[in-house]
Amino acid sequence: RAELPAVEPDGFVVRHQLDVPVDKAAAYARLLAIARWWDPAHTYSGRAESLSLTAAPGGCFCEQLADGGFVEHLRVVLAQPGTTLRLAGALGPLQELGVSGALTFTLQEQRADLTRVTLRYAVSGRTPKGLEGLAKPVDFVLGRALQRYATSLAAPDAARE
């Protein structure tokens, strides 16, 4: 399920939800293995293997660049293993606009081998042209990311991580 529950000139909210065929621990572990599911087309380097996500105080969803540089995509602000992962920051083209965002993944066990994953990204801030025009592209990218995440969990080794 996907929805854009709020789209305003000064912000928007993107929400996606799906069920994955693993328990909450495996679902959470795969969230952290972001290089296994993030679309390389939505990186600066074009290489998903350059991505990392550290679930620790001040942890980073970061990307190493070939020239020795890096990109801090988001900063980890809440990590509750098996339950919630929240990151703060502005993804992609939002970064240079000076807006803020909160990306939250919530995991809810439906049964022993089925977890509901909800992605919610709330963005706010003022820009000269407003943020309404960015809501649908961000919704598309994050919806695709969550689908890739779910597909990666269908791999035979997913439940063993």
Predicted regions: what they are:
Residues 1-19, 106-110, 140-143, 151, ...:
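Hydrophobic-ligand-binding modules of eukaryotic lipid transfer/binding families
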Residues 2-50:
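Hydrophobic ligand-binding cavity/cleft-lining segments
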Residues 11-19, 48, 60, 71, ...:
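Intrinsic-disorder/low-complexity, polar/charged segments enriched in Ser/Thr/Lys/Arg/Asp/Glu/Gln
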Residues 22-24, 31-38, 57, 65, ...:
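Sec/Tat-exported extracytoplasmic proteins
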Residues 26-31, 61, 76, 87, ...:
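Hydrophobic pocket/interface hotspot
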Residues 34-73:
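Short beta-edge strand/loop motif at the mouth of beta-sheet-based domains
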Residues 51-52, 67-114, 122:
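Hydrophobic-ligand binding "helix-grip"
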Residues 116, 122-161:
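A conserved amphipathic terminal alpha-helix motif
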